[in-house]
Amino acid sequence: MFDIAGKTMKPVSEVRSSDEMERWWNVLAEEGRAKKAIESLQKSLTSTEIEVLARQVFEEVSLRAVDAGVSLPKEYILRLIGELSGMGPLLELIARSDIEDIAINLGHIYVYTTSNGWEHAGPAPDGIGDALRVMIDRAGQRAPTPDYPIADAMLQVMVPLVDGTVRRKGVRINYVMPPASPYGDTITLRVSSYRTASDLTHGSLALLCQNRLPPVPRPKFDPKDFPRGNGILTPEAANYLLSVMVHGGTLVIAGTTGSGKTFVGQRILQEMLDYYPRGAIRLFIVEDSNEIILNGWNGDGKTDTGNIIYTVTRPEIRGGPPPVTMYDLIRSALRSRPHGVVIGEARGAEAWELIRAAATGHGHSAFTIHATSAEHVWPRFLQVVQAHPDAARMSEIQIAQSFAEAVTAAVYIERNPQHGQIVREIVEVSTIVERSAARPSFSPLFKYEAGKGLMPTGNRPMRPGFRANDLNIPESIFKAGL
C-alpha cells in the first residue's frame, strides 16, 4: 500500500488472475450498457457516439481499477465498443490484420487467416445479425429480408484503435437468411484494409522478394483399411474416390432416380472431412430440401455445424415472393470463401456455375446428376447447362474443355433389378478433350462385372495432380484381374 494526497492505494499490477480480470470486464460492460440505455432514451446513438461513450466508461472504470491495484488493458476499449454496438467480438476480429474472412454460421464464428486457413473462433453473440442488417440499411444498401433472403453489401467500417486513432476497413458482407438458410443466418465478411501513407512507403516489390505465402494446409492421405464385403464399393475403389476428394478434386455422382446418389455422396464427403481438423474445410451445400447432413450435426441452429453451410431453394409461387434458385445460392456461395460447393441435384444453370467454381480453385466439390450410364453424364450435363446464358452462347467444345478442367472423376450408380444397388462404373475425366466428338474423354478405372463385383479395368489415373503417386495410393489397386 502507498499514499498519494492522503489516499491509500494498492500498487498497480499488470498480472492478475483471469477471474479477477473477468470481474472487472463485467463491471465495465454493465456500466457501459447502463449508460447506453440512458443515452438511448433521447435518441438512437451513432457508431461515433457509441465509441465516445465506451471510451468515457473505460476511463471511469479504469480509475477505480487503479485504486484497487489493477490496470485494465486498453484492448477492453474495442471489446466494449463491440459489446455496446451489438457487434460483439466481431469488431475485434475485423481489427486484426491477419484475418481476411469472418464467417458467422448460425451461432458460431469462424475466421480465415492465410497461415492457418479456417478456424473456429467461438460462439456468435445474440443479435449479431440484427446489428449487421442495421449497418447495411444505414449505408443505403439492401439488407436481406424473408422475401429477398440473399444480400451482398460493401461497407466501410471505422475501427477504433487502442491509441485513440481510427483505421478504415472495407468489409464486404454476404448475407443469407431464412428461408434460404433454413436453420438461421449465414454471414460472411471479407475484410480489406485501406493502405495508409506508411503502407505505401514501405510496400514495394522488396516484400515479394523476402516473403511468400505458406503452403495450403493439407493432410497426407493414407489409404484406409476398408472391409471387403458385398457392398457397392471395393476397398480399392473407395480409397480412390476418397483420395480424390481429400486432394481437392471434384466428383460427379450420376445415376437413376432412387439409386442412392445422395447417400453415396454424403458418405464420401464425410470421410473426406474426417481427414481434416473439424471446421478446417468449409463446404456450402445447396439443395431443394436438406438431405445431406455432415459432421454428425443434429439440426439445432445453436450448435456448431463444423463450418458446413446448409442452404435450400424456394420454388416460384404465383403471387408469392421471388424464387430462390440454386443458381442464386451458388453465386452467394462463391462470396463465402468455401473450399467446395455441393449440389444435391444439378439440373439447370447451377451446373455451369459449379463447374466454373471448381475450375477456379473450389475443389472438394461434388454434385449429383440424373443419367442412365457413365457415358450419358456428358450429354446430360450438356443439356442442363444450356439454361445458363453464358453456356448457351458457347460451343460444345468450349463447354467440354471447361468440364474437363473442373471435374476429376465420375461415379455411375444404378439400382439393378437383378443385382440391387451397384456402382456400374467409376471413370476418370481426362483434361484432354476429344475434339472430333466435342466431348471430354472418360477413362474407366473400375467397372462392374456380374459375379465379381466392381473390378479394376487396368487403366491408371493419368490426370495431373491426381495420379496414383500424387494421391498416395498404390498403382497396384488399378491392376486388371485384382
Can you annotate each of these PLM segments?
Residues 104-106, 113, 155, 177-179, ...:
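Flexible glycine-/small-residue-rich
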Residues 238, 248-254, 263, 267-404, ...:
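Switch/coupling sub-region of P-loop NTPases
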Residues 102, 175, 362, 407:
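Residue-level signature of catalytic and energy-coupling elements of molecular machines
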